[in-house]
Amino acid sequence: GNDEQAFTYLLSKEMKMLEKYVERFRAAGIRMAVTDSVYELIEKETAGRYIGYLESEGYTFKIYEILDACPAKERQKRLDTKEKFEKALNLFYQEDYYLGRNLFTEVLKECPDDEVAKWYLFLCEKCLNAEYGKSVSGALFSD
């Protein structure tokens, strides 16, 4: 077979799961996303950032945005805010929505087109306003 067929064969669970989120990724401005199993193989050759995890059919996959797929200016802005973004994400996972919200706001001041940071910012706001209470899922794009 060809490379595409081999890739699909080797990573069929991940491919099936990611296919469900293609439109959400596009809407969030994510040009390329990979699971942790792929990112581990390519992280030394590419720039990327952890953006969260997805849950599907009993599986949980960590998701990385490949920043090399972005235009140069956008890529640089996301690289410049990567550490702040990941710290904000960790605060979100620790249910520190106030500090997480503040850091996501800082990320957006530097990189206003970061739709993933915007999504988490709004989710932090909802959690702070008790729309979700303690039952919030930390999964990316969960509704």
Please name every model-derived segment:
Residues 11-15:
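A short beta-strand-to-alpha-helix junction
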Residues 1-8, 19-20, 26-143:
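Intrinsically disordered, glycine/charged-rich C-terminal tails and inter-domain linkers
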